[in-house]
């Protein structure tokens, strides 16, 4: 039976254990995810406390990380989502995403509504991908794809 968390505490503690094991074993999220049948972004989000993993994937990642049966069980629970506490994020990487939404949020909203009509882009029926590509001017660029299902507002 699927179980749900009612506070973020247990999953936050598990996330600390997972990150510690990842560092101790010198693993990448990609290596941990291998063989799960899930996307790298989904598994990483689950390991960071934002999604539940199917039983097979939970057992596989737990084995790679050296986690116990309690961790396997907890990885399968539906978490209390949201990893950024109230207020403006202070982590520089997370803040840049916050800044992007501050600058481009109204533009994204206007263009989504213009192209699709009144509605939202789902973060539930959603895929995320990040690619590292060369920058023609030198260095590297991040290409981040947010792929969510459009859900129209339905008058009632």
From Swiss-Prot:
Task of the protein: Catalyzes the reaction of cyanate with bicarbonate to produce ammonia and carbon dioxide.
One record GO biological process: cyanate metabolic process
This enzyme's EC code(s): 4.2.1.104
Annotated catalysed reactions: cyanate + hydrogencarbonate + 3 H(+) = NH4(+) + 2 CO2
InterPro entries cross-referenced by the UniProt entry: Cyanase, Cyanate_lyase_C, Cyanate_lyase_C_sf, CYNS_N, Lambda_DNA-bd_dom_sf
Similarity annotation: Belongs to the cyanase family.
A Pfam family per the record: CYNS_N
Alphabetical UniProt keywords: Lyase
Enzyme class: lyase
Top-rank lineage group of the source organism: Bacteria
Active-site residues, as the UniProt record annotates them: 96, 99, 122
Source organism: Burkholderia ambifaria (strain MC40-6)
Protein name stated in the entry: Cyanate hydratase
GO molecular function: cyanate hydratase activity; DNA binding
CDD domains reported for this sequence: Cyanase_C
């Amino acid at each position: 039976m699927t179980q749900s968390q009612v506070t973020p505490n247990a999953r936050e503690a598990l996330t600390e254990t997972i990150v510690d094991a990842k560092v101790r074993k010198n693993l990448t999220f990609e290596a941990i995810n291998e063989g799960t049948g899930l996307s790298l972004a989904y598994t990483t989000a689950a390991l960071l406390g934002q999604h539940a993993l199917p039983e097979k994937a939970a057992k596989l990642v737990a084995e790679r990380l050296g986690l116990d049966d309690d961790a396997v069980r907890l990885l399968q629970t539906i978490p209390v989502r949201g990893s950024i506490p109230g207020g403006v994020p202070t982590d520089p990487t997370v803040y840049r995403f916050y800044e992007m939404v501050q600058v481009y949020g109204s533009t994204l909203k206007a263009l989504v509504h213009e192209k699709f009509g009144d509605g939202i882009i789902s973060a539930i029926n959603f895929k995320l991908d990040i690619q590292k590509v060369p920058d023609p001017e030198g260095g590297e660029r991040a290409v981040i794809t947010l792929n969510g299902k459009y859900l129209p507002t339905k008058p009632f």
